[in-house]
Amino acid sequence: MQGKYKVITLCGSTRFKEEFLSVQKQLTLDGNIVISVGLFGHSGDNEIWENMDEGTLTRTKEMLDDMHKAKIDMADEIFVINVGGYIGDSTRSEIQYAKMHGKKVNYLE
């Protein structure tokens, strides 16, 4: 909690950009502080990814994964964007991390 506001970190495949944005808006209007992804690797931000060499791309993805775990640490709970029930390996690992750290886990579907 930050004051009277619950902090929620969004997790899920970045292919679901529209759902991330929609859920972020709704949770914010519901009175929560929402932490989301910084980049959409699977559904946007191509200008970032297209000019990276393989080594830089790998290091950047590792950094973003590590940063997302830090975002989970800051949150009271996570909200999983699992459109059609889809949960990929990265999201599965974030859910496991959140549970190991005593965070509540909620799901879109």
PLM segments and residue spans:
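Conserved catalytic or regulatory cores that recognize and/or transform ribose-phosphate-containing ligands
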Residues: 1-109
